[in-house]
């Protein structure tokens, strides 16, 4: 037992000097949060411009970490029909934000790929409009909870 304790104590200084793979640099995290907030604000403004708020409230997914955010954004983007008017730029920006977060997540998280909801081919306009409203609410929630992106 004494040998194990001595070995642990001898290796402790070495383990403190070696950086953990995937250890988060505070500057990188703050830069990521700032960029996500900026992109989310732009997306909310663009959605509001093309699809004004009609006072309806939609339930949104929870912001639980970067993996859940990527999955939600990609899923909402899949639900928005390409044929729905005025959404091509919005879809591009959602894809850009999801791609940015996914790239950051791959470099800083050890988790699996996020699971994306399947695309639906019925009631395209209704599903697209609801997905747009939900992604708007989700982005507002994301801006308030941007600190949770540090989690995987």
Curated annotation (Swiss-Prot):
The residue range of the signal peptide is 1-26
Q: Which InterPro entries match?
A: 4_helix_cytokine-like_core
Cellular component, GO annotation? extracellular region
Secreted found in the keyword field: yes
Disulfide bond: present as a keyword of the record? yes
Q: Which residues form a coiled coil?
A: none
Query: Which UniProt key words apply to this protein?
Result: Disulfide bond, Obesity, Secreted, Signal
| Main subcellular localisation | secreted
Q: Which domain of life is it from?
A: Eukaryota
Please describe the organ and tissue distribution of this protein's expression.
Expressed mostly in the liver.
> Which positions form S-S bridges?
109-152
Q: Where found, per UniProt?
A: Secreted
What is known about what this protein does? May function as part of a signaling pathway that acts to regulate the size of the body fat depot.
Family membership: Belongs to the leptin family.
**Name the record gives this protein:** Leptin
Upper lineage ranks? Answer: Eukaryota, Metazoa, Chordata, Craniata, Vertebrata
């Amino acid at each position: 037992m004494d040998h194990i304790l001595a070995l642990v104590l001898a290796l402790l200084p070495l383990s403190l000097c070696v950086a953990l793979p995937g250890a988060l640099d505070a500057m990188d995290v703050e830069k990521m949060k700032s960029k996500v907030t900026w992109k989310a604000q732009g997306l909310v403004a663009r959605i509001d411009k093309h699809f004004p708020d009609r006072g309806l409230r939609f339930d949104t997914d929870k912001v639980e970490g970067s993996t859940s955010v990527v999955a939600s954004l990609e899923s909402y983007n899949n639900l928005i029909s390409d044929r729905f008017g005025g959404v091509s730029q919005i879809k591009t920006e959602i894809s850009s934000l999801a791609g940015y977060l996914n790239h950051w997540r791959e470099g800083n998280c050890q988790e699996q790929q996020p699971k994306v909801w399947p695309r639906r081919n019925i009631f395209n306009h209704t599903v697209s409009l609801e997905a747009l409203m939900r992604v708007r609410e989700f982005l507002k929630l994301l801006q308030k909870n941007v600190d949770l992106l540090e989690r995987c």
